[in-house]
């Protein structure tokens, strides 16, 4: 049984799909005006693992992750680069896909773009106007939050606490400071960049919040199981999505479970342009850090807890994966999925417990320690296959030993040096043994002496 922490109810709950034969999940995707940073990547990695777990437990899963390809940030980027929104969004969508593939993330079932769903957006706004939950003002259309009496259920914020300023737009055309825009009129830059559409309220473009409500409805219907995203989206974005969707469809629960991953900091500071500390996935990859190392670093902390990104996080991830890949040496890891090996039950149980990936990783470490102590080759092979298959379930050990270490040395020479070192140690000639270890290290080979007297590299 899968248990997940539901932000809406503020407690861990047994996950019970609306349709036991078909799980539906929507996750807020990127706004494509720049390359992805590690905060973006954390969210993608978390829901990628959840996607794999749900498929394992329930079979059919429809995972929708949108692309926000019309937004003020995209328009500003297009204007600054003397380009257009389609070129900017297409370029950065491609970059996003490349970066996410590099960290072993599977593609969602559907990846709708806001610009391709404007018709759905307009119809949803019309429905909100007709039902009295929205109003026109100075060529804008706003959602009236006072018309939705459950506003604040997700975030805990109440309508009378929403004052102008901070994250609430100051606008005299609103009935309430917390009212948010559903449709905005085109301005000069919109006309210049062709970032506008025809609508019953004139030429313009949609607000951000209505885009996700429309796309989730278009691909998953009025009600679905899981809505995910970063904790920074809880308010106002997700709160506003709930208000729109439940107001548009009477009796709808919209999303049954709300899942949020925690904040990401860099050296205990908020990641921001002003601090010049934004860490891009592409920059890490270009510096020679493997995508799988980035993935491990993002998975090491429980998804709901804050993750502080430091150099140690990366070095620890690299060291751990080196250790794991050494255990896989000799296995055909590329075809391990077709083997009869079973994924560890304890490993899966950890994931079922509110996606406790750190606990699952701890189980991998326990399996690794046990493998190193085993002398029965048949049992050792069986456990190693299970170890690799379990790791691959969360997107690790997707490569092979040879590719990971890019070994281009004479295997016989390495084994000869290891045998000479054993003889030196047996004869208590420790200086010679240490020199051989150093020689191997210079060749890029790290050796490990096991309790059973064997040496692995």
Swiss-Prot record:
The residue numbers the entry assigns to motif 'KMSKS' region are 270-274
| One family name in Pfam for this protein | DALR_2
Provide the cofactor note recorded for this chain's UniProt entry: Binds 1 zinc ion per subunit.
Q: Its Gene Ontology biological processes?
A: cysteinyl-tRNA aminoacylation
Q: What is the top-level taxon of the source organism?
A: Bacteria
Q: Where does Zn(2+) bind?
A: 28, 212, 237, 241
**Motif 'HIGH' region at which residues?**
30-40
Keyword Transcription regulation among UniProt keywords: no
Q: Which GO terms describe its cellular component?
A: cytosol
Give the E.C. number(s). 6.1.1.16
Needed cofactors, names only, are:
Zn(2+)
Print the keywords alphabetically: Aminoacyl-tRNA synthetase, ATP-binding, Cytoplasm, Ligase, Metal-binding, Nucleotide-binding, Protein biosynthesis, Zinc
Binding of ATP, residues: 273
Family membership? Belongs to the class-I aminoacyl-tRNA synthetase family.
* HAMAP family per record: Cys_tRNA_synth
Summarize the subunit comment.
Answer: Monomer.
What's the name of the protein? Cysteine--tRNA ligase
